[in-house]
Regions:
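Extracellular loop and loop/strand-boundary signature of outer-membrane beta-barrel proteins
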Residues: 90-95, 175-180, 281-287, 332-338, ...
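Outer-membrane beta-barrel "beta-signal"
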Residues: 446-448, 460, 487-501
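N-terminal, post-signal peptide beta-strand-biased segments of exported outer-membrane/organellar beta-barrel
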Residues: 15-129, 435-438, 461
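Residues that define the transmembrane beta-barrel architecture of outer-membrane proteins
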Residues: 46, 100-105, 186-190, 290-296, ...
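Transmembrane beta-barrel strands of outer-membrane/channel proteins
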Residues: 64-72, 120-124, 206-210, 311-315, ...
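Residue-level signature of outer-membrane beta-barrel architecture
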Residues: 56, 110-113, 192, 196, ...
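Repeated loop/turn-to-beta-strand initiation elements of outer-membrane beta-barrel proteins
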Residues: 62, 115-118, 201-204, 306-309, ...
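Outer-membrane beta-barrel translocator domains and adjoining extracellular loop/strand segments
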Residues: 76-83, 131-137, 216-225, 231, ...
Length: 501
């Protein structure tokens, strides 16, 4: 049951994943990304994040951008596991978790003077959502679902040993549990840097991003019930606590009467009942995690005539999160313990071309170096060896982007774009607690020059995810075969204002 609670809390730790980008990175920091996607060769205000060397080609002056996004995500896991039939009668169950971030803010600023530009931005660079799981997950429920079979098997063993005359647990084939989990994950990033235009065509950027992680998890597992002996549903913990007391009273009486044979029998019953009662006791957790790390960033931009090329490299961010635990009767989240939480290095390359004075197109490429980032430990299912989850990733994440923008008139632009995301994770990485599914993302929107130096951007962005099927002969560590099918949905709305002083 300790393993049960670890799994259910584990799902929280990774449940509030990013809305666009790699395993732990948000790339949708500006509304211009939402409405065009391929922004890696930008020379507008959003270049502060997407192409920081490109700000050297902005107009002289002070530029400011304020953005707000609303993101809504669902995760759906269809799990098939024979013992699930003990709770509802169906071996296949659909588990759905919802994560939402009603408001994700970001601020961009640039001061440009001749060959120099100084830029900064503040944004939610990772996570950004809260997730609630009211019905648990398959990996969680699988460990509860085997309780009826475990009791029947234990009864047979006690009969074989002569401890019980008959198996009083025969007929136990149903279970239920009350579980609740809620989690949030936020990575706040403050980026500062300087860009210098080396020649009329070439500029370079150097800067850093300070990252602060704030995670929070709370949950409980209560009232595990079973129809013991085929009877009514009863609380398993209370049943075996009472059973243990009765057996201990009988054992003490036989010991006092010097009846050692019956003493040994009832002593064994008391010990087994106490063990089951402990395993099925209620569990609770209330824990926060915090940590910080620094990301060095370098960039280059080459601009000539109608062409622009931008390159950015973000170094791997070494980062640990520390437990700040208020309640934990599981023994799994000790106060003060640190867990690896690195942000993978990122390489981006973008090319833009002005097809016509009113028509522009861009393409981009992202590569996340996921295999080099330290992650929380997990067990290799075959060997049982504990290692960082990065060892279960075959190759880093690759993203391919394209977008186009058209000036409808002097004061309005429309744009659209798409992105293909390909994850390199293997079966051992995937679980209903943490899964990455390759996808296609689409965005469209418009920009409106509502005043001489003021621009309004609006956009809608959504993602179509593939389905990933994982079959295992040891579902949830139970020794019984099972299958999960993973998929997700993602929708983001954005609005922003760009102003030049």
């Amino acid at each position: 049951m300790r393993k049960l609670f670890l799994i259910s809390i584990g799902l929280l730790i990774v449940s509030t994943s990013t809305f666009a980008g790699g395993l732990l990175t948000n790339t949708n920091q500006h509304v211009l990304f939402l409405r065009m996607l391929a922004r890696d060769a930008s020379t507008q205000i959003d270049a502060v994040y997407s192409n920081p060397a490109g700000v050297a080609f902005m107009e002289n002056g002070f530029h400011l951008s304020l953005n707000g996004q609303s993101a809504f995500q669902t995760r759906t896991i269809t799990s098939t596991f024979a013992p699930f039939a003990g709770f509802g009668g169906n071996a296949t169950k659909v588990y759905k978790g919802e994560a939402s971030a009603p408001f994700i803010p970001s601020v961009f600023a640039v001061y440009k003077k001749d060959k120099w530009a100084f830029s900064g931005n503040f944004a939610v660079t990772g996570g950004g959502g809260k997730a609630t799981f009211n019905e648990g997950l398959g990996s969680f429920e699988s460990l509860v679902s085997v309780v009826p079979g475990m009791l029947v098997a234990a009864g047979n063993e006690m009969v074989d040993k002569g401890v019980l005359p008959i198996n009083i647990f025969n007929g136990t084939n149903k279970y239920s549990v009350d579980s609740y989990m809620r989690g949030k994950q936020m990575i706040f990033g403050l980026q500062l840097g300087a860009t210098y235009r080396i020649t009329d065509y070439l500029s370079a950027f150097a800067g850093v991003r300070m990252n602060y992680v704030s995670n929070g998890y709370e949950g409980h597992i209560r009232n595990i019930e079973a129809n013991i002996g085929g009877g009514e549903m009863v609380n398993v913990n209370k049943y075996f606590s009472d059973y243990a007391k009765q057996a201990r009273t009988a054992a003490d009486a036989y010991l006092a009467a010097n009846d050692l044979a019956n003493y040994a029998k009832y002593d064994a019953i008391a010990k087994e009942a106490t063990k089951v009662a402990g395993l099925t006791a209620d569990k609770e957790l209330d824990c926060d995690q915090t940590g910080w790390g620094v990301t060095p960033i370098l960039g280059l931009d080459f601009k000539m005539n109608k062409w622009n090329i931008g390159v950015k490299y973000e170094f791997n961010t070494k980062l640990n999160v520390e437990n700040k635990t208020r309640i934990d009767n599981t023994g799994l989240f000790a106060n003060g313990v640190n867990t690896p939480h690195d942000i993978p290095a990122l390489l981006t390359v973008g090319v833009s071309y002005e097809i016509l004075p009113v028509l522009r197109a861009s393409v981009g490429y992202h590569h996340f170096f996921d295999t080099n980032a330290r992650m929380a430990d997990a067990k290799e299912p075959v060997t049982g060896q504990t290692m960082g989850k990065q060892h279960f990733i075959k190759q880093g994440t690759n993203e391919y982007l394209g977008g186009i923008e058209w000036d409808v008139c002097k004061w309005a632009q429309v744009s659209a774009g798409m992105q293909r995301t390909k994850y390199g994770v293997g079966d051992n990485y995937q679980s209903d607690m943490s899964f990455a599914v390759s996808s296609y993302s689409y965005g469209f929107g418009a920009g409106f020059d509502i005043a001489k130096n003021l621009k309004l951007n609006v956009a809608y962005f959504w993602t179509d995810y593939d389905k990933y099927t994982k079959e295992t002969p040891n579902y949830g560590g139970t020794g019984i075969a099972g299958k999960d099918v993973f998929t997700r949905t993602n929708k983001v709305f954005g609005i922003g204002l760009d102003y030049k002083f």
